[in-house]
A protein has these predicted regions:
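Helix-to-loop junction immediately C-terminal to a conserved catalytic motif
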Residues: 48
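ABC-family P-loop ATPase nucleotide-binding domains
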Residues: 75-125, 132
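Conserved beta-strand-loop-alpha-helix hinge in the C-terminal portion
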Residues: 191-211
């Protein structure tokens, strides 16, 4: 079970998240939506302990961390002077993973990352991330920068992975979430509201309602 409780998260005395509770007990794909600046990325970082906040986040009895939870930032940090193969080994060593021999995306092994396009860099990071099977994945705008074929490959991979893992996807591509997620969390006014797949019509009304 994944449980995130954020009593308060502030930046320079501005409240970003407050009295937020998120609890997921079953594997599946879950969406996270919200307007720009609502705190979607901050939520992920708080849960992982990458940002200071008042609250707690647990996966079962363990604290959520980068050791037991996978995280793909919207703009992954890569080392341009490494090849993809070198980066995969570096990532595996950093997070105590077994280097993989099979990868989701085919990429040149001997090219430096600095020679890659934005989409190829995203593929490089995802390949490194998926070297291990995690129980929880936080994916922040994972489809951004990828071409149609890569998005198709990634989505099908995540759908299969979601049979045994909790996968939370932050995305502005709402149709992908509607068509594939078990439920969607709407982040608005510092808090989250959950909508299951039978309530997605209500989600749109709530999202565009200017009242709290």
């Amino acid at each position: 079970m994944l449980k995130i409780e954020i009593k308060s998260k502030t930046y320079s005395n501005d409240i970003v998240l407050k009295n937020l509770e998120l609890e997921i007990t079953e594997p599946g794909l879950y969406g996270l939506i919200g307007k720009n600046g609502q705190g979607k990325t901050t939520l992920f970082k708080c849960a992982l302990g990458l940002e200071k906040y008042e609250g707690k986040s647990y996966l079962g009895k363990e604290k959520v961390s980068l050791i037991n939870t996978a995280f793909c930032p919207a703009e992954p940090i890569l080392y341009d002077e490494l090849t993809t193969e070198e980066f995969n080994k570096f990532y595996a060593k950093l997070f105590m993973l077994e280097p993989s021999k099979d990868y989701l995306f085919d990429l040149p092994k001997d090219k430096l990352i600095k020679q890659f396009s934005t989409g190829m860099k995203k593929k490089t990071y995802l390949n490194a991330l998926f070297q291990k099977d995690f129980l929880v994945y936080f994916l922040d705008e994972p489809f951004n920068g990828l071409d149609i074929e890569a998005n198709y490959i990634l989505l099908n991979y995540l759908k299969e992975k979601s049979k045994t893992s909790i996968i939370i996807i932050s995305s502005h591509i709402i149709d992908v979430l509607y068509n594939n997620c078990k439920g969607i969390y709407m982040l608005k006014n510092n808090k989250t509201t959950y909508f299951n797949h039978l309530e997605f019509d209500q989600l749109e009304i709530a999202f565009f309602n200017n009242q709290s």
